[in-house]
Regions:
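HotDog/MaoC-like acyl-thioester-processing domains
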Residues: 2-3, 62-114
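Hot-dog-fold acyl-thioester-processing enzymes
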Residues: 1-58, 113-114
């Protein structure tokens, strides 16, 4: 069973382009913040990393969009860790609409740097 982290989010003005569609950079920022919160909840937060001179860094992100959400739309971000591969830490995420339909499916690869 995978450990899930979920956050509900209503897209605001800073999250969307002039066309009122989700900006990819806003999605990445939200995924990064949710991943950090989840890592902290799992015991790999600041006291185990940054306070010891270690830094989490995102190396790669991939995402597939079924539909791009729009301004003022309520969405749910779900993220979970994958199996560690040596010094690489994969993490997966999906963005769901208000009906639970998948809007985005993605993955990110994290490194723990000294």
């Amino acid at each position: 069973m995978r450990e899930l982290w979920q956050e509900d989010w209503t897209l605001g003005a800073l999250d969307v382009s002039p066309a009122r569609r989700l900006r990819f950079s806003a999605l990445l920022a939200k995924v990064q913040l949710a991943s950090i919160a989840h890592a902290t909840a799992l015991g790999a937060g600041r006291e185990k990393t940054l306070d010891r001179g270690l830094l989490w860094a995102v190396s790669r992100v991939r995402a597939r969009f079924a539909r791009v959400p729009r301004y003022d739309e309520r969405v749910r971000l779900v993220t979970w860790p994958g199996e560690t591969m040596h010094a690489l830490f994969p993490r997966y995420f999906e963005l769901l609409d208000g009906e639970g339909r998948q809007l985005v499916l993605g993955s990110s690869l994290w490194l723990l740097m000294d």
